[in-house]
């Protein structure tokens, strides 16, 4: 089977919703490039899941980082999970813990409990010194805001 060019009529025939997904992806990319934090987080999710764009964990991490560094809690969580798994970034439990800690600190209710449990699960893979380092990085991140 030969692949169809994304904008071709054959692509639309193979997947009728493609033009809609492509248009949504293009609009999200434009917003993300303009600095829209929600668009950056959404684009990270799109690259992470392969929805509307080819799956690419490196690109997901790049866009999640941009949103996370602006304080977007869900992007912080997603970036932390990428560091935990080593997807698109080198596996780094210190940075995983830091981003999950930042995300958990702004969540509420059950969402906060879930994020704190995920952070604490990562802590079981770390030394006491690494946890202290991650907490210090999170504090430094807050202090720089």
Predicted features along the sequence, with ranges:
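Hydrophobic face of amphipathic alpha-helices that form TPR/SEL1-like repeat modules
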Residues: 42-49, 53, 78-85, 103, ...
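Alpha-helical tetratricopeptide repeat
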Residues: 8, 22-29, 37, 41, ...
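Short helix-capping/linker turns of helical repeat alpha-solenoids
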Residues: 7-8, 29, 33-36, 49-51, ...
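Helix-turn-helix repeat elements of alpha-solenoid scaffolds
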Residues: 16-22, 56-57
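Terminal, low-structured helical/coil segments at or just beyond the last alpha-helical repeat
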Residues: 111-145
């Amino acid at each position: 089977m030969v692949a169809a060019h994304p904008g071709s009529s054959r692509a639309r025939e193979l997947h009728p919703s493609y033009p809609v997904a492509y248009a949504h992806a293009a609009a999200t990319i434009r917003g993300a490039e303009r600095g829209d934090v929600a668009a950056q987080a959404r684009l990270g999710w799109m690259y992470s899941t392969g929805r509307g764009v080819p799956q690419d964990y490196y690109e997901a991490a790049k866009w999640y980082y941009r949103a996370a560094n602006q304080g977007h809690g869900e992007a912080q969580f997603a970036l932390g999970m990428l560091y935990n798994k080593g997807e698109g970034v080198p596996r780094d439990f210190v940075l995983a813990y830091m981003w999950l800690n930042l995300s958990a600190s702004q969540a509420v209710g059950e969402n906060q409990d879930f994020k704190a449990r995920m952070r604490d699960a990562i802590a079981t893979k770390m030394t006491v010194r690494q946890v202290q380092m991650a907490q210090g990085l999170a504090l430094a991140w807050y202090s720089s805001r």
